[in-house]
Curated annotation (Swiss-Prot):
One GO BP annotation of this record: tRNA N1-guanine methylation
Subunit structure: Homodimer.
Keywords noted in UniProt: Cytoplasm, Methyltransferase, S-adenosyl-L-methionine, Transferase, tRNA processing
Protein's name in the database: tRNA (guanine-N(1)-)-methyltransferase
UniProt cross-references to Gene3D superfamilies, sorted A to Z: 3.40.1280.10, tRNA(m1g37)methyltransferase, domain 2
Residues reported in the UniProt entry to bind S-adenosyl-L-methionine: G113, V133, G134, D135, F136, V137, L138
Annotated compartments: Cytoplasm
Protein family according to the UniProt entry: Belongs to the RNA methyltransferase TrmD family.
Enzyme Commission number(s): 2.1.1.228
Source organism of this protein record: Francisella tularensis subsp. holarctica (strain LVS)
Length: 252
């Protein structure tokens, strides 16, 4: 997969290039990243990429000309049909489903805004989709872009050493992940790993993990549960959990 990054701070993307799973994917030629700095496409000696906002107001707005030139160059490099995604608080929320949708593209151009944002006319002329990573505001689009890239890269075939790592992740099946434990089996304070995980009975372990995924999602993200078509067995697990929870409260 190919990424084109439009950013005035391309150095920030060394984190993607140099560390962890994403760095390994780049080294193995499963991913390529090209950065296009709008300052390189300016026409004045100060390399100006922003200006004041028409109508007044605080903050500066990123200019149309250098951004459009950077996007055009990115399209020439990655392909004229490459989808342009603008990382913006006004965009649709990024989630696992959106990640899978974006994976259908062989290449993506990620536009990272700064200041108060970009000239609206650039969005009208070049942006195919606006994506937000949450209902909060950051200083720029670079961190959201890296978040999106990391999420997509780890979903690519053969990027993770164990393909089960992707299948068992939170949100892959619409549920949160189950609890994980490692050695020692018992901590000095007596807190122990659930016995079933030490039993070696893979069928019972799978049942326990499914139950934990359902309960954890119900407790922390009921909105996800409401969007799923649960099996009769899954529904029974949750019904039993709710009954046990009420009974436990009644005994307190």
């Amino acid at each position: 997969m190919k990424f084109g990054i439009i950013s005035i701070f391309p150095e920030m993307f060394k984190a993607i290039n140099d560390f962890g799973v994403t760095a390994r994917a780049i080294k193995d030629s499963k991913v390529s990243i090209s950065c296009f700095n709008p300052r390189d496409y300016t026409t004045d000696r100060h390399a100006t990429v922003d200006d004041t906002s028409f109508g007044g107001g605080a903050g500066m707005v990123m200019k149309y000309q250098p951004l459009s030139a950077a996007i055009e160059d990115a399209k020439n490099t990655l392909g004229c049909g490459t989808k342009v995604v603008y990382l913006s608080p006004q965009g649709s929320i990024f989630n696992h489903r959106k990640a899978q949708e974006l994976l259908q593209n062989d290449s993506l151009i990620l536009l990272c805004g700064r200041y108060e944002g970009v000239d609206e006319r650039l969005i009208q002329d070049y942006v195919d989709e606006e994506i937000s990573v949450g209902d909060f505001v950051l200083s720029g689009g670079e961190l959201p872009a890296m978040l999106v890239m990391d999420s997509l890269i780890r979903l690519l075939p053969e990027v993770l050493g164990n393909k089960e790592s992707v299948v068992e992740d939170s949100f892959y099946d619409g549920l949160l992940d189950y609890p994980h434990y490692t050695k020692p089996a018992v901590l000095p304070n007596g807190n122990a790993v659930p016995d079933v995980l030490l039993s070696g009975n893979h069928k019972e372990i799978a049942k326990w993990r499914r139950k934990q995924k359902l309960i954890r999602t119900y407790e922390r993200r009921k909105d996800l549960i409401e969007c799923l078509c649960l099996s009769a067995k899954d529904k029974q697990i949750l019904d039993d959990y709710k009954i046990d929870k009420v009974s436990t409260k009644g005994e307190e």
